[in-house]
């Protein structure tokens, strides 16, 4: 019969996983800065260093930065001023977000929203394997999605310097 509803088709499909609680956690940020400056009418300097450590709200996500900056301004002659600026930063992080395809195109964030709450994290028939049977729903298990992305690291070193002579 077309349009008929089978009331027993969804038996056993009770809420068992709160995907938001499983995937999201409290983030944490530590940020430290120190600087020193001094000078007189002939020479001035400024030095600073910093450290930033952020642990993200998704498991395994983070961002760390070490930074250094130096500015020196020197009046060598009444007609010549020399300035030098240098800044360096070392950044490393893992955003934990890689876009998938199809129903997984939003990565972890959308899979948390779209994965049914009746789906268990682990496959009941295959211990230590993530559950992939969502009764016809084509979505990657959010926990598996996170596990696959934990080594998605980005590393960047930046050095910016300038020198100026002003006559």
List each language-model region with its residue ranges.
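Surface-exposed loop/interface segments of Gram-negative outer-membrane beta-barrel transport/assembly proteins
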Residues: 1-16, 56-61, 67, 71-160
């Amino acid at each position: 019969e077309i349009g008929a509803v089978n009331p027993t088709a969804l038996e056993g499909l009770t809420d068992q996983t709160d995907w938001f609680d499983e995937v999201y956690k409290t983030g944490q940020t530590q940020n430290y800065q120190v600087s020193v400056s001094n000078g007189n009418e002939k020479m001035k300097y400024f030095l600073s260093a910093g450290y930033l450590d952020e642990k993200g709200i998704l498991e395994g996500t983070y961002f760390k930065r070490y930074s250094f900056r130096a500015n020196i301004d020197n009046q060598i002659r009444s007609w010549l001023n020399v300035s030098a600026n240098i800044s360096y930063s070392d950044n490393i992080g893992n955003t934990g977000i890689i876009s998938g395809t199809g129903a997984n195109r939003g990565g972890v964030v959308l899979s948390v929203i779209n994965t049914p709450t009746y789906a268990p994290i682990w496959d009941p028939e295959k211990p230590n394997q993530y559950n992939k049977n969502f009764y016809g729903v084509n979505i990657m298990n959010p926990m598996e999605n996170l596990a696959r992305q934990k080594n998605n690291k980005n590393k960047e070193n930046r050095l910016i310097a300038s020198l100026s002579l002003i006559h």
